Amino acid sequence: FKFDAGIEPKNSVQLIEKTDRELVKEMITLDKFIDVLIPRGGKGLKKFIIENATIPVIETGAGVCHIFVDESADIEMALPIIENAKTQRPSTCNSIETVLVHRKIAEKILPELTEMLLKDKVELRYSEEAFGIVKNTDFTHKENLKLATEEDFGAEYLDMIMSLKLVDNVEEAIEYINEHGTHHSDSIITQNIDNAEKFLNEVDSAAVYLNASTRFSDGGEFG
């Protein structure tokens, strides 16, 4: 049978295997054949399509996601959550780009966190204060430990790159995320229920998590 639109079910989903930019440029001008585009990919691809398409475009947002490690965080819990959120599939928009660490536990967590992520071959870009805590430690792949610039905070890397900075409290973390994030997915690692509730209520993101990875923001997990 056929639907009213005359489309056979077996042909309702089709795959274009070529991915070169010239083909994309041609396709996004076929307004006689394509009704709407929903681009998925990196910032460069989305910008290219928005600037060149003659077809209506539904723009999808970037994913600058954060994890805040609070003063009361269980460090043994925090480490694998951060590792999962950054390294499992870094090219996705629900992977984290920045970790915020409460200043009072920085000296306790940073050496172990840094060693873990450097072993995973993540390039780390630390704020000056955070960098100062670990700069004299002999890490594996220490060449990937670098000082961050202002451009790193708010950047969507979609790669094995992560920035990190220290904050004084949950209020500062919330303010930073709301200013530098893209309102996608953000998480707090804490044992303090008041700080957890404040973070979950005041971070203006589509998904906020307590003691969990931002990688849960996906169709399969949401059913």
Describe each model-derived feature in a short phrase.
Residues D35, E97, A206:
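Conserved acidic residues
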Residues F1-S72:
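Rossmann-like NAD(P) dinucleotide-binding subdomain of oxidoreductase/dehydrogenase enzymes
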Residues V99-V101, D159-D168, H183-I188:
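Short, well-ordered beta-strand elements within core beta-sheets of diverse protein domains
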Residues E112, E175-G223:
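C-terminal core of ALDH-fold dehydrogenases
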Residues F3, L45-D159:
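ALDH superfamily catalytic-core signature
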Residues L37, H102, A173:
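Residue-level signal for inorganic ion chemistry
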Residues L15-K18, L145-A148, L164-D168:
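Short acidic-hydrophobic, aromatic-tinged amphipathic segments that line or gate anion-handling sites
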Residues N169-V170, I193:
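Catalytic core of tubulin tyrosine ligase-like
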